[in-house]
């Protein structure tokens, strides 16, 4: 089990280094010199989440960060994170954040404005 923990932590390190770029379980498994099935197995046994769930979690965090804190266009964000097209990026974002990328950015911008107004008062 020690080996599984080590591989899992290497996987998490790779996720962090990729900064949320959407990549397949197969790609990460190849980098770790193991099979995708084994990567998912150790991920689930060590953390309770599959490798794909971890990949998606890191991708969602990156999407949130870009939409909240950058002026990049939606297309630039999708490209930077490795999505094949805007449609897939939009569906992925809506699935995980509940709204489209444009709507999420608008909501975050409104929250920021409200906070700024309250801090000035």
What are these regions (language model features)?
Residues 22, 26-58, 78-103:
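Basic/polar phosphate-binding segments, predominantly the helix-turn-helix DNA-binding elements
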Residues 10-24, 43, 47, 64-73, ...:
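Basic, amphipathic alpha-helical hairpins
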Residues 1-15, 19-20, 33-36:
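Polybasic "coupling" helices that flank or enter modular domains
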């Amino acid at each position: 089990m020690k080996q599984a923990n080590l591989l899992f932590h290497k996987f998490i390190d790779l996720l962090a280094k990729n900064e949320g770029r959407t990549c397949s379980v197969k790609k990460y498994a190849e980098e770790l010199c193991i099979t995708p099935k084994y990567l998912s197995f150790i991920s689930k046994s060590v953390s309770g989440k599959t490798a794909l769930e971890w990949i998606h979690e890191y991708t969602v965090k990156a999407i949130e960060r870009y939409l909240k804190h950058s002026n990049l266009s939606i297309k630039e964000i999708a490209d930077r994170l490795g999505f094949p097209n805007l449609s897939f990026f939009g569906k992925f974002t809506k699935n995980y954040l509940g709204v489209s990328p444009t709507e999420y950015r608008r909501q975050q911008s409104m929250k920021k404005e409200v906070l700024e107004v309250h801090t000035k008062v």
